[in-house]
């Protein structure tokens, strides 16, 4: 997404069917959850001034995933695939509409043994399940109005052996897909439940009103290695990030972590990161289009009341390292590491007007966000939460967020556009912390000639106050509290070229698409944080590629489709800095090739073959949270799709 830090989905509005789907988008936006894309029918990506429709994050963009709709007639589909690393995926859907009633039920299963291996070649994979059901009733223009009521229910879980523990530079060069013995107990379990009751009213005069009542619940317990000890004093403890950042200096800790040295006692501290999240709310929007002489005016407005929260109840268990195996030495007391609840209540609303006259289109909108946050820290001394000891930290933000965009067709094939809007992200529950605010400007050119589409956009995100986050995943302490970065600048260029040079009457199509993004970042003031250390004016923001390129070549015929893709990412900083990048603070550039073949063997039956990382290149994707981590090695996956 445009001009935002790569910290999970923390700086984008993540939605499913127009509903905020992150576990707690206001109080804990960086939580680990993302809907399964394999069950989606489409994905909408919105950037620029149109973001006033969506919030609370209005700088980097919005992603709206559209789930499988209730079909208009009896429909079913089944697809399954299997391939490298015992990776298997199965998806089945069935639905129908009879008269005013309709339904859709689907199930998705995805599992793999994973491509990372430890010494005994034990568990390192994942298993995921996803179930969604929809039930709908539609009337047929009762008194000039059509009503559609739909109930959506969803359940998902994950059981995986993922870890924060990466590799040292030396070990990555020798065996990039290896796992250390200290990650043996790392395990993640999640449960997700969603429910949405929707009502759509469509009048004969074109008025459309959509209302949603929603509730989401998410539980996760990520049991993972956090620290290494060689004694009980504070200075005798190191985080795994500190150990792998300098394994030579911390050689004693590193040898325990890797199983090369035995230690009887609390040598390896494994944290039960137990958290519960909820989000609930009600929202409604109305839209209508009028003809005004030779022009058209479309007005859309909406309002939402939302509540969400995060409940942390965590402890550390101490393990010994004996003969390369972890042995439980002392279990921790529940709630002794973190014992707090953070909640948020938010009112938001917007109005968006689009006026179109001849070749000119003007879009202007205004959004309002009013959020109240509170953190209740019951402390480690009150695990029962009696309230005898409690630290309460409130915060709030109220903002108006305007945006305007202009599009003009010079000729039918060529148009220019520009836009400006106010960017916003809510603060965390830290006393007197400011929200993120920015002024975002874009301007571009689009050319669409038969078989050819070209687009170039320049953007400038000028932050009056950027927020950083104290995430373990980003090298911080893991409090998830945000901190004020201050003024910053993110600017760049996005370019897209797609073409199909084949004559229209040809049965074979050749589609080519090339995209390139250049991003330049700069922080404008000095500050110090636990996540980034000492930062100076002029430093670049970490984990944002300066150069990124993607290319696709597709050949399509009646029976066979072939697609070859290439993606290139340039060198990227992992910590703030300027000038030449230090090797230990760099993600080296890499180029990855992928390919897909689809063959229709019968009406409704398609065979698929998918290859990831054809050259089997071992490349680094991150140096955080703790050590170097490799991207997907070469993987070959075959499958079948059946529609009926």
Regions found by a protein language model. Name each.
Residues 19-47:
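Short acidic/polar hinge/loop motifs at secondary-structure boundaries
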Residues 277, 294-308, 333, 337-463, ...:
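Structural signature of Gram-negative outer-membrane beta-barrels, strongest in the C-terminal barrel
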Residues 75, 82-111, 119-163, 187-203, ...:
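Transmembrane beta-barrel wall of Gram-negative outer-membrane proteins
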Residues 142-150, 189-380:
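Face-selective signature of the C-terminal outer-membrane beta-barrel domain
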Residues 464, 502, 509-512, 567-577, ...:
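C-terminal beta-signal and adjacent terminal beta-strands/loops
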Residues 292-293, 356-359, 460, 481-577, ...:
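Gram-negative outer-membrane beta-barrel transporters
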Residues 1-23:
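Extracytoplasmic beta-strand/coil segments of soluble accessory domains associated
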Residues 208-226, 409, 415-419, 435-502, ...:
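Membrane-embedded beta-barrel scaffold of Gram-negative outer-membrane proteins
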